[in-house]
Curated annotation (Swiss-Prot):
It is found in: Cell inner membrane. Its main location: membrane. PANTHER family: ATP SYNTHASE GAMMA CHAIN, ATP SYNTHASE SUBUNIT GAMMA, MITOCHONDRIAL. Gene3D superfamilies: 3.40.1380.10, ATP synthase, gamma subunit, helix hairpin domain. The lineage of its organism: Bacteria, Pseudomonadati, Pseudomonadota, Betaproteobacteria, Rhodocyclales. It comes from Aromatoleum aromaticum (strain DSM 19018 / LMG 30748 / EbN1) (Azoarcus sp. (strain EbN1)). This is ATP synthase gamma chain.
């Protein structure tokens, strides 16, 4: 059995660890609320631009059809935008979305896909794709706690341009959707080509005045819509990250508290045994006299 001094040292070490995890839990809770606010603030813009894109894409103003709306007869070349975190200590968040991405890539390979290109948002996903030997054409890391579209759109645009130029037949995005504080869901969604289901049904019949012309307006609107989808995915993932980290750190703090209690019990028993032994020795010595 360990000595009382060794047990006290262990208790002190676990107490220090608990202080750290408790502080990280509180920081994550604060960041989670801010991330949720950003996520909710982005939703009205994404919904409004979706409605405009739906109306414009189905308006009979021109025979022109944007590349983002063209469905390919056969999908042989696939792009994947993988959204993960830059840091760990967030439970199984990254592991779950990486598993979804890996299963998707295996499925595409089994269906005869000849090429898979990846764009990684987040350090964890970038490292994962490198370990898997995937073809990573672009990546962005260290987005910080406040994602900016200007920083992430460069790497994402490489993927969008590849689709628009006919180098890819479909583009998917994998991220963790925020459900609530205790639940986050890893999802894989088709980003391109845009489907009628994704855009939704136009609200009535719309007539617009186009400046300078319909093609320019449609081109710009659809690109902005896809960018909004990517930003929303990143915002959802960041809210999920902070929620998962808060829960993970709370679990770590609770476990540390239990360990401290168990060690304290062992220490008390050790101290009691030592006192009993000393008393026995004193009594034995007195009896001998």
């Amino acid at each position: 059995m360990a000595s009382g001094k060794e047990i006290r040292t262990k208790i002190k070490s676990v107490q220090n660890t608990r202080k750290i995890t408790k502080a990280m839990e509180m920081v994550a809770a604060s960041k989670m609320r801010k991330a949720q606010d950003r996520m909710r603030a982005a939703r009205p813009y994404a919904e409004k631009i979706r409605r405009l894109a739906a109306n414009l894409s189905q308006a009979n103003v021109t025979d022109y059809k944007h590349a983002f709306l063209v469905q390919k007869d056969e999908v042989k070349r696939v792009g994947l935008i993988l959204v993960t975190t830059d840091k760990g200590l967030c439970g199984g968040l990254n592991t779950n979305i990486q598993r979804v991405a890996l299963n998707a890539m295996k499925g595409w390979d089994a269906s005869g896909t000849t090429e898979i290109q990846a764009c990684c948002i987040g350090n964890k996903g970038f490292g994962f794709m490198q370990r898997m030997g995937a073809k990573v054409v672009s990546h962005v890391v260290q987005l910080g706690d406040t994602p900016h579209l200007e920083k992430m759109i460069g790497p994402v645009k490489i993927m969008l341009d590849a689709f628009q130029n006919g180098e890819l037949d479909a583009v998917y995005v994998a991220y963790t959707r925020f459900i609530n504080t205790m639940k986050q869901e890893p999802v894989l969604e088709q980003l391109l080509p845009l489907t009628g289901e994704k855009l939704g049904t136009p609200e009535g019949s719309w007539d617009y005045l186009y400046e300078p012309d319909p093609q320019v307006v449609i081109d710009e609107m659809l690109v902005r819509y896809v960018e909004a989808l990517v930003y929303q995915a990143v915002a959802e993932n960041m809210a999920s990250e902070q929620s998962a980290r808060m829960v993970a750190m709370k679990a770590a703090s609770d476990n540390a508290k239990n360990v401290i209690g168990e060690l304290q019990l062992v220490y008390n028993k050790t101290r009691q045994a030592a006192i009993t032994k000393e008393l026995s020795e004193i009594v034995s010595g007195a009896a001998a006299v």
